[in-house]
Amino acid sequence: SQXPQSETDYSQLSGEWNTIYGAASNIXK
């Protein structure tokens, strides 16, 4: 999102992606 909280939104998105990527890595294995 745009605005003063963009860094917070990016951090939250990054955390969500880490969770998704971790799950995908497990499936993948």
From Swiss-Prot:
Predominant localisation class: secreted
Localisation per UniProt entry: Secreted
Lineage: superkingdom: Eukaryota
Sorted UniProt keywords: Allergen, Secreted, Transport
GO cellular component: extracellular region
Family listed: Belongs to the calycin superfamily. Lipocalin family.
Protein name (record): Dander allergen Equ c 2.0101
Organism: Equus caballus
